Each structure stands twice: as structure tokens, then as C-alpha cells.
UniProtKB/Swiss-Prot annotation:
CDD domains: SerRS_core. It comes from Nitrosococcus oceani (strain ATCC 19707 / BCRC 17464 / JCM 30415 / NCIMB 11848 / C-107). This is Serine--tRNA ligase. Homodimer. The tRNA molecule binds across the dimer. InterPro entries: aa-tRNA-synt_IIb, aa-tRNA-synth_II, aa-tRNA-synth_II/BPL/LPL, Ser-tRNA-ligase_type_1, Ser-tRNA-synth_1_N, SerRS_1_N_sf, SerRS_core, tRNA-bd_arm. One of its GO terms (cellular component) is cytoplasm.
Length: 427
């Protein structure tokens, strides 16, 4: 949530900044509601003051034995008027809150202008795409003889699901363990296990609700949703807290399944594991003091990059333009891995700095040692990495002419020493 003061005191400038990301809204309606809120608040305060004054007068009159019936009638009338004004104020505040929850974060000054992914700016590249001496297959063709089964998944659940059997399932698990080990042992993250069902308040807190409900799987008649990312429960670990300065930064890592309806993605990436209803991620979340969040963003991005580098997967880092930012993000780096089967780079991680946008929604603060007063923390998160996409990137980049897949040395200890996955015909 944006600081309401920005909208109250700098409405025109804030509206211009929101326009950078293509967001249009009824600023005039907000201004009208805000004026009414101020009027109702002043009226409420005046009526409360009058009621308090009348209460004292009634007390004195009663002590002196005077007739207080007229004063009581006036007090009742004041009380009724106050209730009416307070009820209207509550309605106006709820309308303003609804508007605020639907406004995205402001793009950072270093976020490039642009409308969509075509305007994203490349920051750097790492690695060289493999020079294969044969026509590379994509992960679907490779996986057909390695235990990647989409047809069975359709029978079990429907489209946009997959089953992995045998060595590919083991490789999938190995990637998860490898990522967790690197992040906990080398990058200083604390591993957490969280629920895979989240309540509405949690999803409002991180910004998925109320705007993106159609993209979520809701559990009917329960108030629960399947989590679209571990960002939701992990960030909400500090909801409603005032953290001591010595606890910061908090660095959490969690492996969870993620569930997304992919509403609005009809016809996109229908082949393979690129866009699934259910997929696994290892998620990085940081809760930090405001003055270090910019550096924390660079560090977190580097932590995700380290996994790709250890696996020897070529990638590039993209600074997302304002029009391509996620709802809650102020600045985002996308890591895009090279896929020989598609002859292009595809997103494998998004690393974002939300500043105090999520913190305001979840009421997460820290006690600033300089002022000894509570202040908003900054929140950041990124995938470290998306496991399914890492799996298919390994398959495509390490494929051999016979359809076998070489296992990077760094993963071989997690695979019981296996160095090559050999294709086999399933009967």
C-alpha cells in the first residue's frame, strides 16, 4: 500500500508516477472522498467535544438539584448525530481503503520507462549458450524417454500438470536440496516450513488480493487459498510485529509447491513445463531496514544468480520496465535462462524490492534505534530458483545427441554419484 500522505499531499505527482506503469485511476473520486473524510473527522471531533462539555454541565446541574431533563434530551440528540457522522465516516474510510488496496507501488527512479517486456533493459549476461553439434530438442521431446509424462498428468488432473517418474523425479528433488543447501550454508538464509494454504488477510498483505483473485485457487467455503508463491506465508511471518533492530535483516528461504490458475494465459506456453498450475519454487525473502534495501536487492539477486552459475546455466539479468512490474514491486530484476530447445532466454527468477509497500499492508515495523520509534520495514523476495524451469533448463543445456542428459558435477552428490541420465523406453 502506498503511503496515504503521498495521495493526500502530492496527488498530481503520484498520479504521474503511477502513469509510468500504465496505471490509470479516478484521482478526482479519491480527492472527493478524502475531502469528505476530513470533513467527517472534524465534525466527529467537534461533536465529541460538545458531548464531553454537556456531560460536565449535566454533572454540575445534577449536583445542584436542577432539572436535567432538557440537558439529557440535548445529550441524546448529540449522541444520535455523532453516531450518524461516525457511521458515514466509517463508510468513507472503507471506500478509501478499497481504493488504496487497488493502487500499485510506484516505480523506482532506476526502473526504465516502457510498456511491456519488449522494453525491459538487459543489465548483464553470464555464460555462453552451448554450441551443440546437433539440432537441440526441447525438454518435452527429451523428457518423453526420461520419465516426463504429460498424458498421465492430464488423466490425473488436467492440462498444465506433469508427472515425473524415476531419474527426473530424483533430479527435481536434488535441485531443491542443492538450492536450499547453498542458500542456508553460504548465503545466510534461515530455512522455514510454512502452510501451503493461506487466508485472505495474508494474500491482501502481499498484494495478490483483492486485485488478482482470478489467478488464485480458492478452497470453497473455507476462506483459504492455495499459495501462488511462498512469498505469501513467509512475508506474513512478521505481520503485525514491531521488530527489534538487532533482529534485522531477516533472511528466510522456503521450498513450497505453488498453485496458479493462469487466468489470462490461455494459449500461452501450452507445451511443456514452462507454465503450470502446480510447480515448485525455492523462495528467498528478506525483511530489512529501509536504508539497506537497495543493496539487499542487489545481494538477493546475486544469490539467485549463484545457483545458475553453480549449475553452469547461461542467463541474462533484465531490469523490468515500469509497465512490466508486478503490482507490489518498485524495482524488479528478472533472471532469464537460455533454453536451446527454444533458442531463447526465459524467465527463471524474479527478484523484487517492494520498499514499504507490503509492510504497510501487513503492518510490519521495526524500532528505529535512531528515533526509538516504530518505522516501516522494507520487504524483498525472489525465486532462488523456480525448480521446474531449472530442471528443463538443465535438460536442454546438458543434452547429448543420443537424448541422454549430463548431470553437472555440483549436483552429482545429490544424485548418488550419477553423472548421466540415460533415456529408456517405458513399457
Amino acid at each position: 500500500m502506498l503511503d496515504p500522505k503521498l495521495l493526500r499531499n502530492a496527488l498530481a505527482d503520484t498520479t504521474r508516477q503511477l502513469a509510468r506503469r500504465g496505471f490509470e485511476w479516478d484521482a478526482a473520486a479519491f480527492a472527493t472522498l478524502e475531502a469528505e473524510r476530513k470533513e467527517m473527522q472534524v465534525c466527529t471531533q467537534e461533536l465529541q467535544a460538545k458531548r464531553n462539555a454537556r456531560s460536565k454541565i449535566i454533572g454540575k446541574a445534577k449536583a445542584q438539584g436542577e432539572d436535567i431533563a432538557p440537558l439529557l434530551a440535548e445529550m441524546t440528540e448529540l449522541g444520535d448525530h455523532l453516531k450518524t457522522v461516525e457511521a458515514r465516516l466509517e463508510v468513507v474510510q472503507a471506500q478509501i481503503e478499497e481504493i488504496l488496496l487497488g493502487i500499485p507501488n510506484l516505480p523506482d527512479a532506476s526502473t526504465p520507462p516502457g510498456k511491456d517486456e519488449q522494453d525491459n533493459v538487459e543489465v548483464r549476461r553470464w555464460g555462453t549458450p552451448p554450441a551443440l553439434e546437433f539440432v537441440p530438442k526441447d525438454h518435452v521431446d527429451l523428457g518423453a524417454s526420461l520419465g516426463m509424462d504429460f498424458e498421465t498428468a492430464v488423466k490425473l488432473s488436467g492440462t498444465r500438470f506433469v508427472t515425473l517418474i524415476g531419474p527426473l523425479a530424483q533430479l527435481h528433488r536434488a535441485l531443491i536440496q542443492f538450492m536450499l543447501d547453498v542458500h542456508t550454508r553460504e548465503h545466510g538464509y534461515t530455512e522455514v516450513y510454512v502452510p501451503y494454504l493461506a487466508n485472505r488477510e495474508s494474500l491482501v498483505g502481499t498484494g495478490q488480493l483483492p486485485k488478482f483473485e482470478e489467478g488464485l485457487f480458492a478452497i470453497r467455503d473455507t476462506g483459504y487459498y492455495l499459495i501462488p508463491t511462498a512469498e505469501v506465508p513467509v512475508t506474513n511471518l512478521v505481520r503485525g510485529e514491531i521488530l527489534l533492530a538487532e533482529r534485522l535483516p531477516l533472511k528466510y528461504v522456503a521450498h513450497t509447491p505453488c498453485f496458479r490458475s493462469e487466468a489470462g494465459s490461455y494459449g500461452k506456453d501450452t507445451r511443456g513445463m514452462i507454465r503450470q498450475h502446480q510447480f515448485e519454487k525455492v523462495e528467498l525473502v528478506q525483511i530489512v531496514p529501509p536504508e539497506v534495501s537497495q543493496q539487499a536487492h542487489e545481494d538477493l539477486t546475486g544469490h539467485a544468480e549463484a545457483i545458475l552459475q553453480r549449475l553452469g546455466l547461461p542467463y541474462r539479468v533484465m531490469n523490468l520496465c515500469a509497465g512490466d512490474l508486478g503490482f507490489a514491486s518498485s524495482k524488479t530484476y528478472d533472471l532469464e535462462v537460455w533454453l536451446p530447445g527454444q533458442q531463447t532466454y526465459r524467465e527463471i527468477s524474479s527478484c523484487s524490492n517492494f520498499l514499504d509497500f507490503q509492510a504497510r499492508r501487513i503492518q510490519a515495523r521495526w524500532r528505529d534505534p535512531k528515533t526509538q520509534k516504530p518505522a516501516w520495514v522494507h520487504t524483498l523476495n525472489g525465486s532462488g530458483l523456480a525448480v521446474g524451469r531449472t530442471l528443463l533448463a538443465l535438460m536442454e543445456n546438458y543434452q547429448q545427441a543420443d537424448g541422454s542428459i549430463r548431470i553437472p558435477e555440483t549436483l552429482q552428490p545429490y544424485m548418488g554419484g550419477v553423472s548421466v541420465l540415460q533415456p529408456s523406453i517405458r513399457g
